[in-house]
Amino acid sequence: MRVFVARQPIFNRKEQVVAYELLYRESEENVYSAKDGDQATTDLVINSFLNIGIEKLTEGKRCFVNFTESLMFSNLPTSFNPKQLVIEILEDIPITPALISRCKELKKMGYMLALDDFYAINPQDEDLLEKLMSYIDILKIDFLKTTRMERRTILQTYGCRGLIFLAEKVETRKEYKQAVQDGFQLFQGYFFSEPRIISGHDLSTHFYSYYELLNELSKEQPNIKRVTEYIERDLSLSYQILKFLNSSHSRLSQKIESIQQAIMLLGFNEIKRWIYILSFKDLSRKGHSSKHEIIKISLIRAKLCELLARKTSRPQPASYMLIGMFSLIDTLLHREIEEIVQELPLKDEVGQALLGHQNDYYQMLELVKLIESNNWDTCSELGNQLDKEEAYECYLEALEWCHNLMDAK
C-alpha cells in the first residue's frame, strides 16, 4: 500500500510561509482502516516521510500533520523531531483523560499541539476540555464553517491563554484581511493566489530582456546572431546557459568556445524552455513571501505537467510545461490573463487553455491541480491513462526539481 503526500502553505501576518500542512492518504481510500490496520498505516507514513524526506517536503519549516485517535497513541508522533512537527488533533477525537495524559506527555517532549477545526469540537465534559486546553498551542478555526461572530467569540474566550489562532480555508483577500483584523496570527488557504488590483505592478526589467529573447526564439526561423547578442549582453544569463549546458550534457566531448556554439548545441527549443524558467526565478527574488510561494507552485506545476505529458506519451511534452508555469501569472502580475496571453509568444493551444478553453493542455493543468490538493479519487477520472504510483513519483520529482532550482545560486 502507498501513502500519497501533498502540502499546503501556512502564512504569518507578513504573508511569509512559516509552515506546511502535510496532507496524506492511502493509495485507494480516503480513510484509515480498522484498528488492526492502524499500525500498518503508521509504518507506511513513517516510511514514506523518510523516503521522501521531511526537509524536501517542508524546506526546513515545521509541518502540521493530522492524527486520528489511534495514531495519537501510536509511536508515529514521536518518530519526528519536535522542532519539525506540529501535531494536529482531529476534531472528532473524544476528549478523555487518556488523551489529556498523552498530550501532556507530548508537550513534555517538546511537541507543539494544535486542535483542528476547533468550532466543531463538542465536548461531553467542559472540564476535560479546559484541562486539554492547557496543553494546546494552536487553535485552527475553519472559515467555511463559522461566522465572523462565532470566530470572534472563540478569540475573546481563549485569547488570554497565549494561544496561536490559525484561520484555515481562507479563500479570499477579504477573508484574510478580516482574519488579521480579528486577531488571527496564522493563515491557511488559497487567498494568497487570488489576484489583487494594485497599480504599478509589472514585470521586472530582466523579465523584459527575457521576453525580448523569447520573441526572437518564437519565430519560425530565429536569427541565431540576434539570439546570441541577447544572451551575451547579460552576464548572468550567459553563465546560466553554459552551466545548464554542462549539466545537461555530462559527456560533452568538446570545449565551448562561444555563446553561439552553446546555443547550437542546446537548440532553440531547449533554450526557450530554460529562459521561461530563468525569468520566473528572477521574478521570485522580488516581492514578499506570498509571491515567492506562487512562483514555487507555478514551477512545480510546470515540471509536473511536463513529466506527466512524457509519461502519457503526449507529443511535444516540453510544451506542457508552459501551461503549468503560467497558470498563476495573472496573480503574479496583477493583470487580466487575456492581456498577458496576448503579449506572450505562447503556443495557441496553451494560450487558449489559460483562457479556460477545455483542450488537452487545460485538462493536464486540472489533473495537476488535483494532484497538488491530494484529490486522488477525481484524478483517476481525469487521468485514466496514468497509474497513481507513477503520477505520485512525478509529483515528488517536480518538488525536488523546484527546490533545487530555487536554491541554485
From Swiss-Prot:
It comes from the Bacteria. SUPFAM superfamilies: EAL domain-like, HD-domain/PDEase-like. Residues 1-209 form the EAL domain. Residues 203-392 form the HDOD domain. It comes from Bacillus subtilis (strain 168). This is Uncharacterized protein YuxH. The gene is yuxH. PANTHER family: CYCLIC DI-GMP PHOSPHODIESTERASE CDGJ, PTHR33525.
